[in-house]
Amino acid sequence: MNTIVVAQLQRQFQDYIVSLYQQGFLDNQFSELRKLQDEGTPDFVAEVVSLFFDDCSKLINTMSISLERPDNVDFKQVDSGVHQLKGSSSSVGARRVKNVCISFKECCDVQNREGCLRCLQQVDYEYKMLKTKLQDLFNLEKQILQAGGTIPQVDIN
């Protein structure tokens, strides 16, 4: 094990995860999720987040189809998708996705199709940004472990 390389990777990991919180991508729920991961379940967070991203993709696609026809929008179906997306984003600590869902729900409540389309575009953008950033984070974790190090705990508060 090269302790200098491990220390650099760990520092990079800590800085990166702090930046994700500072930029509003993540909230404390992500920290709580990370606490559930241990040596027996080393990929727990990555697996949960992967399921979240799969759900996001499906929900965004379903809502997009529901909003396609301007004369026949099923706002109840869109609202149901927004509700599911908000719940799952809250459970993994995807703060920006969750925040867009709040605005999205307001647009559904007043049956504002244009507002819903804007929110759909924004939630798709935020989910894709977060996916890229968390993939980078998980790759950094793998590099640390492959170098013989341990994943550092990061105190965000």
Swiss-Prot record:
| Residues that bear Phosphohistidine | 83
> Could you tell me which residue ranges the HPt domain spans?
41-148
Where does it primarily localize?
cytoplasm
- According to its UniProt record, in which tissues is this protein expressed? Expressed in the whole plant.
Modification N-acetylmethionine occurs at: 1
Query: Which GO molecular function annotation, any one, does this entry have?
Result: protein histidine kinase binding
Q: What is the effect of changing residue 83 to K/A?
A: Impaired AHK4 binding
Modifications made to the protein after synthesis? Two-component system major event consists of a His-to-Asp phosphorelay between a sensor histidine kinase (HK) and a response regulator (RR). In plants, the His-to-Asp phosphorelay involves an additional intermediate named Histidine-containing phosphotransfer protein (HPt). This multistep phosphorelay consists of a His-Asp-His-Asp sequential transfer of a phosphate group between first a His and an Asp of the HK protein, followed by the transfer to a conserved His of the HPt protein and finally the transfer to an Asp in the receiver domain of the RR protein.
Q: How does it assemble?
A: Interacts with the B-type response regulators ARR1 and ARR2. Binds to AHK2, AHK3, AHK4 and AHK5.
Cite the domain annotation text. Histidine-containing phosphotransfer domain (HPt) contains an active histidine that mediates the phosphotransfer.
The entry's protein name is Histidine-containing phosphotransfer protein 5
- Species this chain originates from: Arabidopsis thaliana
